[in-house]
Amino acid sequence: MAVGTLEHYESDGIIILPVFPNWAMLGAMLALKGPAALPWISNAFKATGVMVKIQDELAGEIYPDNYLYTSSKNPSDQDKKRLAKGAGIVRQVLKRAGASEDSIMELKPSGAHPSSCCRIGEVVNIDLETRVENLFCCDASVMPESLGLPVVWTAVSLGKRLSKHLDSQIN
């Protein structure tokens, strides 16, 4: 996911990246589409993947459930507009590259990298510590708003910063 179209659609809250799910995930995604997707399974090895990632609106809930926490976030109207615009751009590019309309399959949006549920300044302080002493949170959930970008480098940077802070507390 290193190459994308950030500079072209960032102001719209959209990036387009070359991504392909692993075969197990693809099989599950196709199965969720129902019987109409069965012909695609045999030709999946010929497919390529393009992901539309958006900067979604902050919404959703986290539910405590005994030992697990589940979450729910339905796309807002603005989220749906951004996804539709991005999918339209991808469809147009694929057609210009020679793909026929019936060779393009659009999968349902899937959530990944939930963010902004433990925002810095609200749930954690600038050192990523919660109100519970020595309990830290260090992932995309501390971001003040949805990044709309892959979060790996940001999360790694936060982890390095936190490790330096914790090291300074010990030494």
Predicted regions and their residues:
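FAD cofactor-binding and catalytic pocket of flavoenzymes
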Residues: 1-88, 124, 131, 144
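Short helix-capping/linker segments at secondary-structure and domain boundaries
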Residues: 57-63, 97-101, 167-171
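Glycine-rich loop(s) and the adjacent beta-strand/alpha-helix scaffold that form part
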Residues: 1-9, 139, 164-169
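A glycine-rich dinucleotide-binding beta-alpha-beta segment and adjacent secondary-structure elements
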Residues: 81-146, 152-156
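An active-site-proximal "capping" alpha-helix that borders the catalytic cofactor pocket
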Residues: 153-169
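Composition- and surface-driven signal marking solvent-exposed, interaction-prone regions
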Residues: 43, 149-150
